[in-house]
From Swiss-Prot:
InterPro entries to which the protein is assigned, alphabetical: DUF5588, TPR-like_helical_dom_sf
Organism the protein comes from: Homo sapiens
Pfam families: DUF5588
Lineage of the species this protein comes from: Eukaryota, Metazoa, Chordata, Craniata, Vertebrata
Name recorded for this polypeptide: Zinc fingers and homeoboxes protein 1, isoform 2
Length: 292
């Protein structure tokens, strides 16, 4: 009996009701997605996307969301983001917009783009400022963003250092080349010796400038780390306050998750170098503003 039921589900349905046929195709796409057969699911969704009536808003949204999620899993993130942006522009209420923002968050997380992930979370928090889990995700994103930005700055500094060093060497040996490998100072004309002395002075200036740049970049990296840590810390504090607020209303596994998350936040807060006075001030500001 069950086998016949599945056979009916997979066979093409000959029906005069187009809506019924399209609905069946959508369910096939949903099943393929659940089985992680993303290419097959995408084909099912795409086959009905253009056939849906312009008045069938609900199914059209569901199908487009399914397409975007499949594209993200298949590594086609830009196409997925285009669909998500289109859905965001057409959102008519808070529920629709929330669904779209969670879709964008999933795509950006899959893309591992921390800055876009943070932007999506900020928009979600603007809609739902008292959701502790979004605040927790925002804190984690900031926690990961700091080292990523610091590494990018370090890479930029390293590249600039190599470029500057190469220019210094070239200015010191302006005639360098394969024929100059056997040249010695005593074989060079007197004018070249004066040129070497002048270039030596320029080299010292270049090295000093390079050192100043390196110091500046190091300060910038430290500033970036402190700033992102401060934002992560503030978001963690906000998460903890909201969890404490909802704690009396919870029981069973919900309460267990709440308490476990609070303990995890407490452990992560110990990794910050902020003084207790600073943490108390952040908490006071968070309470007084109602949201951050």
């Amino acid at each position: 009996m069950l086998r016949k039921l599945w056979q009916w589900f997979y066979e093409e349905t000959e029906s005069s009701d187009d809506v019924e046929v399209l609905t069946l195709k959508k369910f096939k796409g949903d099943l393929a997605y659940r089985r992680q057969e993303y290419q097959k699911a995408l084909q099912e969704y795409s086959s009905i996307s253009e056939k849906l009536s312009s008045t069938n808003f609900a199914m059209k949204r569901d199908v487009q969301e399914g397409q975007a999620r499949c594209l993200a899993h298949l590594g086609r993130h830009m196409e997925a983001l285009e669909i998500a942006a289109n859905l965001e522009n057409k959102a008519t209420n808070t529920d629709h917009l929330t669904t779209v923002l969670y879709l964008q968050l999933a795509i950006c997380s899959s893309l591992q783009n921390l800055e876009k992930t943070i932007f999506c979370l900020q928009k979600l928090i603007s809609l739902h400022p008292f959701n502790p889990w979004n605040w927790g995700k925002l804190a984690e994103a900031y926690l990961n963003l700091g080292p990523a930005l610091s590494a990018a700055l370090a890479s930029s500094q390293k590249q600039h250092s190599f470029t500057s060093s190469d220019k210094t060497i070239k200015s010191f040996f302006p005639h360098s080349g394969k024929d100059c490998l056997l040249c010695f100072p005593e074989t060079l004309p007197e004018s070249s010796l004066f040129s070497v002395e002048a270039n030596s002075s320029n080299s010292q200036k270049n090295e000093k400038a390079l050192t100043n740049i390196q110091n500046c970049m190091a300060e910038k990296r430290e500033t970036v780390l402190i700033e992102t840590q401060l934002k992560a810390c503030a978001s963690f504090i906000r998460t903890r306050l909201l969890l404490q607020f909802t704690q009396p209303q919870q029981t069973s596994f919900a309460l267990e998750r709440n308490l476990r998350t609070q303990q995890e936040i407490e452990d992560k807060m110990k990794g910050f170098s902020f003084k207790e006075d600073t943490l108390l001030l952040i908490a006071e500001v968070s309470v007084s503003l109602g949201f951050m």
